[in-house]
């Protein structure tokens, strides 16, 4: 019987876990004396897009040892790279280096920039010297827009107070809001996807780093994996996200204070006890719906030199919009965070018109409406969700119509 020479002297066969950038995984078998380049070719045949007839396709990819975060050399063998059985390797496409521009291209680009350059102040004055003077009160326009946003928030603050008083008269209110409180306990906004976390930890990444990467990349495994590789040498990679630990401490302290206050109620009239209990539940719900600053925006603004508390205040005032928050920090910082919690004047025509509306009156007796107001107060971007809700949508529509009508008059 004839046996090929390479099979007689073949090394130990290893089973390797290969993970591609698109999230696909498979097992690849290779001997210890197989070169990294041959292993890469085999991996590309299995899971890469494009044709292997193009020799550049192999050179455009690289294999990374997940546990040690090393890029494997194509010229070395698996044994020389100290790869063990059941190790995890990542198949990643290399980033193409930016081509060096030619001198002719540089001069043409500079000429194009000069042609497209905006005119300076002197050029504008010369071009508009013969035009009649015209002034526009831009400040008034900006103030109107700011007043619209501010008044809408003030309306929600005042309506929440009214809804709480109305619902306190409902004998079933405590049970209803206990259920709402339990539902908020199951809120998964701050939880990390366990499946995604397990995928990254199985690749060899520490759990704390994997959790941080998933939060920064909206639970996307491929993006989180790239972030971990790019920031592997970053000394701040193990630093927790800004505001994350602070929120946990605040919620723990709040839970302790609420439990102690509940224990101190003692013996009193049954109606007073239910009102006190309802008040505590309202406080818990509001704490759980507290504003959550966008982690990436916080990091970006703090890198500019702003204090973490100032950054979170700016993002809260500007609904997590990073550019608007930056302008707020650099400007006069109006409105202030304290102004956001002030309600509208209860004797104002606007508030009286809203309370006199039958649809609003009926909606204020619905616990779901109160939860919707609380959510929109701290997360204004969720307004669309509540506008489309069959129970809260009609209430929001009436409030919007009344505001727009009185705002125009």
Curated annotation (Swiss-Prot):
Residues 235-273 are annotated as: Disordered. Residues 14-98 form the Ubiquitin-like domain. Non-catalytic component of the KPC complex, a E3 ubiquitin-protein ligase complex that mediates polyubiquitination of target proteins, such as CDKN1B and NFKB1. The KPC complex catalyzes polyubiquitination and proteasome-mediated degradation of CDKN1B during G1 phase of the cell cycle. The KPC complex also acts as a key regulator of the NF-kappa-B signaling by promoting maturation of the NFKB1 component of NF-kappa-B by catalyzing ubiquitination of the NFKB1 p105 precursor. Component of the KPC complex composed of RNF123/KPC1 and UBAC1/KPC2. Interacts (via ubiquitin-like domain) with RNF123. Interacts (via ubiquitin-like and UBA domains) with the proteasome via its N-terminal domain. GO terms for molecular function: polyubiquitin modification-dependent protein binding; proteasome binding. It comes from Rattus norvegicus. It is found in: Cytoplasm. PROSITE patterns: UBA. One of its GO terms (cellular component) is ubiquitin ligase complex. This is Ubiquitin-associated domain-containing protein 1. The UBA domains recognize and bind polyubiquitinated proteins. InterPro entries: STI1_HS-bd, UBA, UBA-like_sf, UBA1_UBAC1, UBA2_UBAC1, UBAC1, Ubiquitin-like_domsf. Pathway: Protein modification; protein ubiquitination. SUPFAM superfamilies: UBA-like, Ubiquitin-like. PANTHER family: UBIQUITIN-ASSOCIATED DOMAIN-CONTAINING PROTEIN 1. Residues 187-231, 292-332 form the UBA domain. The modification N-acetylmethionine is found at residue 1. Keywords: Acetylation, Cytoplasm, Repeat, Ubl conjugation pathway. Its main location: cytoplasm. Residues 245-264 have a biased composition (Low complexity). Residues 357-396 form the STI1 domain. Pfam families: UBA_7, UBL_UBAC1. One of its GO terms (biological process) is protein ubiquitination.
